[in-house]
Regions:
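Cysteine-nucleophile active-site neighborhood
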Residues: 293-371
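Beta-strand->loop->alpha-helix junctions that form or flank phosphate-binding loops
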Residues: 37-38, 171-179, 267-275
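A short, charged/proline- and glycine-enriched loop
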Residues: 1-2, 235-241
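Internal gly/pro-rich beta-alpha loop/helix module
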Residues: 124-234
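ATP-dependent carboxylate-amine ligase catalytic core
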Residues: 2-110, 118-142, 150, 154-157
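Structural motif
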Residues: 5, 84-86, 115-117, 147, ...
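Phosphate-binding active sites in nucleotide-utilizing proteins
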Residues: 238-315
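C-terminal and late-domain segments of enzyme folds
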Residues: 107, 236-238, 250-263, 267-268, ...
Length: 447
């Protein structure tokens, strides 16, 4: 089975572009690949999903223990002909100035061969020096081959023999520069896949242009299929419906989190806060993931019926979990990207506003101060934050600590609520079971 991780010396090298080109090409070849993303990024898996038509999954060694990551990888790679994982940032870049949770650590944990994406612009033999450093920085590096990105055929033919002689690594192919296939970005990274109307055409052109020695790559990356691992939790029969917001405004939900909720006994009922006038019927819980509500603040405010329904549900004690953008939606008002302020659901105090910069960015550890729907007092969970918007009322039911000992308070928690900026990774934790139990209890005692 072909299994490999696509990494690069630094961010901005074209990992997502190359990964999507490779996935599309593998799909065309009838290989039936599956896709993974190293780290907590929500957007890159959307592009993988567009290339394959199936879910891509996150693997994060800060948010999850190594055994959990191995179990998730085995679960989602099962039955596929190839597994392709996209790295994050530079190959060795992890939490702070360490390799923790880096692409290299993920490759090391899963014993994955690494295909290194290199952009040759502005350098020649210096590339070989850089590659030697990457090969020697940690042992084993797991790097088995090189792919040149934004590279012409002529330059590929010139550089390939030199790089192979200097590094001992095969240069397995190249992807030429395609100006018409550039994927635009915004304040949280790339635009989402759903916002690019001609994405399928772009992916097709990338796959057409990709030059790759597939036979050589298959030999370099052939590994035994991952052994079946015991499930993180024994799957339960669906026992309660949980409403999950899913549309352009709320699109940051991990596929693994949704599967963990299903495994815990939830039937997921998806709805759109942009378009639906009511919550799904017969629900015992509500999950509002993150996303880009600030881009759609006007449209969200205009859906008066749903805003009222969510406010009423909150007052009735409907078990609710809201992360980042979902948390902003529960507030009183939200400043849109047009700088206008719009009413939101009003379940919580506070007004969301644009700070113009990243706020509390990165990994952190969040500790509960008291028992609540999802947490026990003193319980600590790894989380991450990534947002430019903030709230005038962030809550104080949790204490949060970053690696450099920076601390702050955040979040609202009660017997029926979790709401705050931190994104949670539910798989492999007690959160899904606790949320489902709260939903069951709500329905049992409703009315």
């Amino acid at each position: 089975m072909m299994q490999f991780l696509i990494a690069a010396p630094r961010s901005g090298s074209g990992k997502t572009t190359v990964t999507c080109a490779v996935l599309t090409a593998l799909q065309r070849r009838g290989t039936d690949p599956c896709a993974f993303k190293c780290g907590p990024d929500y957007i890159d898996p959307m592009f993988h999903r567009s290339a394959l038509g199936v879910e891509s999954h996150n693997l994060d060694l800060y948010l999850s223990a190594p055994d959990t990551v191995r179990t998730l990888y085995a679960r989602y790679a099962a039955g596929h002909g190839a597994a392709v994982c996209e790295g994050a940032m530079g190959f060795y870049d992890g939490q702070g100035l360490t390799t923790r949770a880096s692409a290299w650590e993920l490759a090391d944990t899963l014993a994955l061969p690494v295909l290194l994406v290199v952009q040759p612009k502005g350098a020649s033999i210096t590339l070989a020096a850089e590659l030697r450093g990457l090969l020697q920085f940690r042992t084993p590096s797991h790097i088995v081959g090189i792919l040149l990105n934004d590279c012409s055929e002529a330059l590929y033919k010139t550089l390939r023999p030199m790089l192979e002689a200097e590094t001992g690594l095969p240069v397995v192919g190249y992807l030429p520069h395609l100006p018409g296939c550039v994927i635009e970005s915004r304040h949280l990274g790339l635009k989402t896949a759903g916002e690019i109307s001609d994405l399928q055409q772009k992916l097709g052109k990338l796959a057409d242009a990709l030059v790759l020695n597939w036979t050589q790559l298959a030999v370099l990356t052939d590994r035994p299929a991952p052994a079946a691992a015991p499930p993180l939790a024994a799957p339960c029969t669906p026992s309660v419906r949980i409403a999950v917001a899913r549309d352009e405004a709320f699109c940051f939900a991990y596929a693994e989190t949704l599967d963990a909720l299903r495994d815990a006994g939830a039937e997921l009922a998806f709805f759109s806060p942009l378009r639906d006038a009511a919550l799904p019927e017969n629900i015992g819980g509500l999950y509002l993931p993150g996303g880009y509500p600030e881009l759609y603040a006007r449209q969200l405010s205009e859906n008066i019926a749903l805003r009222a329904a969510i406010r009423d549900a909150g007052q009735e004690g409907l078990p609710t979990a809201a992360e980042c953008g979902g948390f902003l939606y529960l507030g009183q008002t939200l400043e849109g990207t047009d700088s206008k302020v719009y009413p939101m659901t009003g379940v919580l105090p506070g007004s969301g506003h644009n700070t113009g910069r990243l706020v509390r960015f990165g990994y952190a550890a969040m500790t509960a101060k008291a028992d609540s729907m999802l947490f026990h007092a003193g319980e600590t969970l790894p989380v991450h934050e990534f947002h430019h918007w903030d709230s005038s009322e962030n809550g104080a039911d949790f204490s949060v600590c970053k690696a450099k000992k920076r601390q702050w308070e955040c979040g609202f928690a009660s017997a029926h609520l979790y709401a705050g900026f931190p994104h949670l990774y539910w798989a492999g934790t007690a959160l899904p079971r606790r949320f489902v139990q709260a939903a069951q209890h709500f329905l049992k005692h409703k009315g």
